[in-house]
Amino acid sequence: MSLRIYNTLSRELEEFSPLQPGRVRMYVCGMTVYDLCHLGHARSMIAFDLVQRWLKASGLAVTYVRNITDIDDKIIRRAVENGETIRSLTDRMIDALHEDADALGIERPTHEPRATDYIPQMLSMIGTLEKKGLAYRAENGDVNYAVRKFPGYGKLSGKSIDELHAGERVAVLDGKDDPLDPVLWKSAKPSEPEEVKWASEFGPGRPGWHIECSAMACELLGETLDIHGGGEDLQFPHHENEIAQSEGATGKPLANYWMHNGFIVTDNEKMSKSLGNFFLIRDVLKKYDAETIRFFVVRAHYRRPLNYSDVHLDDARASLKRLYTSLDLVAPQALAAIDWNDPYAARFKAAMDEDFATPEAVAVLFDLAGEVNRTQSPAQAGLLKALGGCLNILQDDPKRFLRAGTTLDEATIQAQIDARAAAKAAKNFAEADRIRNDLLAQGIVLKDSPTGTTWAAAQ
């Protein structure tokens, strides 16, 4: 079975065929770095980290670009509020972004361009659009894109221009021919810091949000990409405008496959800073380990909404413990490579090849864990660990993972286990039960077997 991807553009599952055999060019819209990242950002990063990992596991070479928006109205406002420079704020937030992403086990993209490093490319594309009659200079000094002059506008959202309305991220400014016309170049305002003003043939100013991605994607990956991704909230207007700009400038499709991840929701509302219902990645990491957060995300299909709550994260942690308990039974055999003809591996691959269906892939892991429990086969345990590696889970030491979270040190716990063994040998079963219950009250579960007693943190 070949890989199939749900293409937002066609609204169908399509067989994936890269432009260049064996190579994939993927661009994903990254963060606007005016504040710390929340779990909604984590979901997008994990989703496309998973995509690029599976593409690599499938034998493809991946060039993955995830941009950084480091010039934006929100960034300017926050820097002014803080009394710091734009560069100081964005450098600090980019460092924090990397700390959060690294903590979650997210691989760095091949390229992570900052918008401010690509101003010449943006100006060049704006100039091309103006020459083609797709951009116009407004009375207020801005340069706007004329959406009604691009025949395909609305094809990603599936609506005509007359059906579309100015969305929450479309600023309706003076001088626009149509409220939907995105700003390509924002003229400098006297009140704005000098560091956000670039010289250009259009006058001093800065780029609009949408043109940033169009120019960076073209510069780093070429005029047509294999995959363009981002959160579902970016379909309109951001990605719709990217298509209009890029295809208007080049005359070629911007991307052959469009992928969009679903929201993390709280109380059925999208998690966002504007709603104030967000949870910072680093705050959640104080309560839950990174692998639990990652597993919480990959248990759901990337296109579906994901409900955040402590209950769901607790359940994710308990489920991970079940898998690690199987790996703790027998030392996994190191595999040189996954045998995809193995029945479990074949099922896992079939799930991932069907639009990265991680819920079905995770179900295979639990079935395989049951097999490991029955057979205690090092080879099967090795396969479980290797398949988990495709999702970047199950790579920790099982004992370390199972024992994490307890406040007791190992020596104290072992002393209690030894005391319980002595009580049982003396047929003082009441004392043995007291020790077991005392440990349980402190979050320690004992497991007796013919070879001795082991322990783990309670689920």
From Swiss-Prot:
Keywords: Aminoacyl-tRNA synthetase, ATP-binding, Cytoplasm, Ligase, Metal-binding, Nucleotide-binding, Protein biosynthesis, Zinc. GO terms for cellular component: cytosol. Monomer. Binds 1 zinc ion per subunit. GO terms for biological process: cysteinyl-tRNA aminoacylation. NCBIfam families: cysS. This is Cysteine--tRNA ligase. A motif ('KMSKS' region) lies at residues 270-274. HAMAP family: Cys_tRNA_synth. The keyword Plastid does not apply. CDD domains: Anticodon_Ia_Cys, CysRS_core. InterPro entries: Cys-tRNA-ligase, Cys-tRNA-synt_Ia_DALR, Cys-tRNA/MSH_ligase, CysS_C, Rossmann-like_a/b/a_fold, tRNA-synt_1_cat_dom, tRNAsynth_Ia_anticodon-bd. GO terms for molecular function: ATP binding; cysteine-tRNA ligase activity; zinc ion binding. A motif ('HIGH' region) lies at residues 31-41. Pfam families: CysS_C, DALR_2, tRNA-synt_1e. It catalyses: tRNA(Cys) + L-cysteine + ATP = L-cysteinyl-tRNA(Cys) + AMP + diphosphate. Its EC number is 6.1.1.16. Its cofactor is Zn(2+). Belongs to the class-I aminoacyl-tRNA synthetase family. It comes from the Bacteria. It is found in: Cytoplasm. Zn(2+) binds at residues 29, 213, 238, 242.
